[in-house]
Amino acid sequence: MRKFKTTFTALALGCVFALSGCNGNPGNHSASGKPDPDFSETVETTDLYDYTGKTEKEFQFKTFVGVPSNMRIYNSLETSFYIKTLTDAELDTYYKELSEAGFTVADGPYFPEDQAHYRKVLDLAQKYGMKQMVGELVVNGISLSAMLRGEIIDSTTGKPAEYTDEQIKAHLEACLGEFKDHPAFYGFSYWDEPNATKYDTIARIQKLFQEVFPGKILYVNLLPITVDLSLLGYTNPADRIKYTTDFIEKIDVPYISYDRYPLYKDASSGKREIQEDFLYNMQVYRQAADIDGRELWTYLQSTGHLGAGTEYVEPKSIADFRWQVNSFLSFGGSGISWFTTFAPPPVDGVGTQFNVGPYDRKGRKTDIYYKIKAVQEEVHAFEDVYFNFDWKNVMTVLGKENEVGYCEGFTYLDEGFAIDTHERIAEYSCQQDTLIGCFEDKDGYDGFMITNYANPADNKTDRVSLTFNDAKAVAVYRLAEKRVLLLNEDGTFNITLQPGEGIFVV
């Protein structure tokens, strides 16, 4: 919000999550698809005020596990499968569906593909307004990923083979060169969850990659900061945060990306719970991104899976998806990959067991597809306003109905990271634990991303009351709809957030 002494401030409220079947028609809808009576309970519409700041930037929604050329079609017990080669028409249909669901970047498939497949899907990505990330390729008998990671073993020495810069650039050209000028070519999916001992290698490859493909993305996704220290590549506990800061210092990419899947089943109670370090990972990676102004990207949970003794549950409701995305938006995130999109095998090479996500193991859309579609449509509907702001900090508010007196996710944050007050907010109260992400645009307007942080499995609504200093009106984006509303005389706005829901207030 801009700071005015004698005039009002226009506020923009943006609820970022659509529901299945929402078509943007007038009327506000709750998680059941019915009108929400609290949407304009204490305000009336006006055409006198507005917030008009906008950008052309697009929120990035990426697939993880893309469309294959040969799809494994499993039997009902998932004990066997046959291979189905997808026709050009079937490939076209899948890309059309991904585009319609709001995906902006398609990743490569689970298993390696050849260049012929990527020629087809690059054209399809362009046709439907998307970008295509290329995955593993083997050309002239040499794996691109293995070469770039230093994993090819010299048969004569038994040690990793060494390649000159020119040899690496030549293989990059051989594998990806024909795609470099394609309008849909996004980059190369390089390394998932490396430890810090690999950073020098990644830095070298990024430099060479940019010499061959300037401006394209060499994609690296990092581990949760809370995993075992040895997995991060350090031995001293005091060095844990260096996993992120060393990446920023050594590797010149325009983003930092990580994963932390938050929804799990408690082994003792059987209850669906939230990982207490979900927000802490956001904090650490947000702080790293802010060192030099990088994009903050993450992976979120669309597929239930069982691995390393933890059962990550399948998101069941629209609230599960809204809650994940809205929490990330409260920390100023700008890109999300869904883990997973097209179904991986039932069990992977290290024993992790997978359910399915937006597509099942017969290649059919699931209910998850429609929930993700709804969420992504709503984010795209207000992204031009959201990206007009820069993230500054976050407030954590304990809800009035919190009976234990603390929220594990909030207490996990470093002391002093979350702020307690903001000059624009005179008073606030929340029924449930609530996040308030604080933003500011180039003209001095303040923005707030307010999220119902209650466990979506508990299905609790969050009655939020905010009193703003020096403000008379709000412009509201909710479910692909914009309304401009007058505040109460004292600057108060009241709203009931559905489970997992969020609003953006300018």
Say what each PLM segment does.
Residues 1-11:
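Bacterial N-terminal signal peptides that target proteins for export
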Residues 18-21:
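C-terminal motif of bacterial Sec signal peptides marking the signal peptidase cleavage site
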Residues 23-26:
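Bacterial signal peptide processing site
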Residues 33-473, 477-506:
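Glycan-processing catalytic domains of CAZymes
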